[in-house]
């Protein structure tokens, strides 16, 4: 059974801890001791607040469920410790220099960097963009105005541009666009909308190319314990972990 070191003890960490089947959490790390202790107790794991000591513990893979900053700060050390690395905060990889250095380190160490599908679906087949022509590639995200701390009386587009521009202007809304860009090998165009009549995050993907065309719409249910977290994003990590040692590989 795969053993997991969990980096970050927030809402997603607790969801992972509640659904251990084909994996076991043996160590958890958080800078806040109470959070680490709480999750450790829930998962029968050891708690750490010192990262170096955490890395000395016995586990096979590290799952980052903390933040972009944490992924960038600890990613290289995790790979150099001989562990594969699951990056939930995929927005960390929007930094080209960081991403290239991290990939090079993974190659040197013979390790893998895993990016879960997160809050969207269809990420596997979007990878056809790496080997075929993509003509149109658009992500339209719609959120409630309150989630972005703005006011709007009707559906309003507040951003239209390339993914890297959206990351600059709306850094808390980068994970989906970066996951799509990495999957396709092609930067996605982004529209960000607010709609006072929606209480969920909606992601619509429009893609057309050599393969044909597709439209994907995901209306996310918030995590039961944290409305700011997509429940689908948490489930995507669980799916990844459950299938790591499955001899039957499904999907591209």
Locate each region found by the language model.
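NAD(P)-binding Rossmann-fold cofactor-contacting core
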Residues: 23-40
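Beta-loop-alpha module in the N-terminal Rossmann-like domain of NAD(P)-dependent dehydrogenases
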Residues: 49-80, 92-96
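Rossmann-fold NAD(P)-binding glycine/threonine-rich loop
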Residues: 90-110
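Short, hydrophobic beta-strand segments that form beta-sheet elements in well-ordered domains
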Residues: 6, 26-30, 62
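General beta-strand structural signal in soluble alpha/beta enzymes
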Residues: 64, 87, 113-117
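A short helix->loop->beta-strand "cap" motif at the edges of active sites that frequently abuts
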Residues: 45, 81-84, 108-111
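Active-site-lining helix/loop region of Rossmann-like oxidoreductase modules
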Residues: 113-114, 119-252
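Glycine-rich adenosine-cofactor-binding loop
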Residues: 3-16
């Amino acid at each position: 059974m795969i053993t997991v070191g969990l980096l970050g003890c927030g809402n997603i960490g607790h969801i992972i801890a509640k659904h251990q089947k084909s994996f076991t959490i043996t160590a958890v790390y958080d800078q806040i001791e109470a959070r680490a202790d709480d999750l450790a107790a829930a998962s029968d794991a050891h708690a750490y607040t010192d990262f170096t000591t955490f890395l000395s513990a016995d586990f096979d893979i590290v799952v980052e469920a903390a933040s972009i900053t944490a992924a960038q700060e600890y990613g290289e050390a995790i790979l150099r410790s001989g562990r594969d690395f699951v990056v939930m905060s995929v927005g960390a990889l929007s930094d080209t220099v960081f991403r290239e250095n991290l990939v090079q380190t993974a190659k040197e160490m013979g390790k893998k960097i895993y990016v879960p599908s997160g809050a969207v679906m269809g990420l596997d087949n979007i990878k056809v963009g790496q080997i075929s022509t993509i003509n149109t590639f658009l992500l339209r995200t719609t959120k409630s105005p309150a989630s972005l701390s703005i006011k709007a009386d009707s559906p309003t587009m507040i951003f239209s541009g390339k993914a890297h521009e959206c990351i600059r202007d709306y850094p808390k809304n980068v994970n989906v666009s970066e996951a799509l860009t990495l999957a396709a090998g092609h930067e996605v165009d982004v529209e960000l909308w607010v709609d006072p009549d929606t209480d969920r995050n909606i992601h619509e993907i429009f893609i057309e190319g050599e393969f044909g065309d597709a439209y994907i719409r995901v209306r996310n249910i918030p995590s039961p314990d944290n409305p700011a977290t997509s429940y689908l994003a948490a489930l995507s990590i669980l799916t990844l972990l459950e299938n790591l040692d499955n001899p039957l590989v499904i999907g591209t």
